[in-house]
């Protein structure tokens, strides 16, 4: 989404100013689908964010990717709104 790209652009700007910082991009999925499918989906989601940050000059060796699939929902509901909240990538400062 446009908002997601703007968030990543801001993160890239911050990371360029803080060149010693490394991050972990966590990929998440909603509850639908198998565990294996959602782990792969979460990984693709996190890798898409990584690729986007790299287009802004952030080195791949500063970015780790981790998928939680459907294991860590932010909304425990079982409806379209909850599912949309749970499909996400989260950036975590690693050091």
Regions found by a protein language model. Give the residues of each.
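Short, solvent-exposed beta-strand/turn patches at coil↔beta or beta↔helix junctions
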Residues: 1-10, 30-35
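Structural recognition of beta-strand segments within beta-rich domains
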Residues: 16-17
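A conserved beta-turn-beta hairpin within the catalytic core of GNAT-like acetyltransferases
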Residues: 21
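Periplasmic OmpA-like peptidoglycan-binding domain that tethers envelope proteins to the cell wall
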Residues: 28-95
């Amino acid at each position: 989404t446009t908002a997601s790209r703007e968030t990543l652009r801001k993160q890239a700007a911050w990371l360029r100013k803080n060149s010693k910082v490394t991050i972990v991009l966590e990929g998440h999925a909603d509850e639908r689908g198998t565990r294996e499918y959602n782990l792969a989906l979460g990984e693709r989601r996190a890798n898409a964010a990584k690729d986007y940050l790299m287009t802004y000059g952030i080195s791949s060796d500063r970015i780790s990717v981790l998928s939680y699939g459907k294991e860590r929902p932010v909304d425990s509901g079982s409806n379209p709104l909850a599912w949309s909240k749970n499909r996400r990538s989260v950036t975590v400062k690693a050091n």
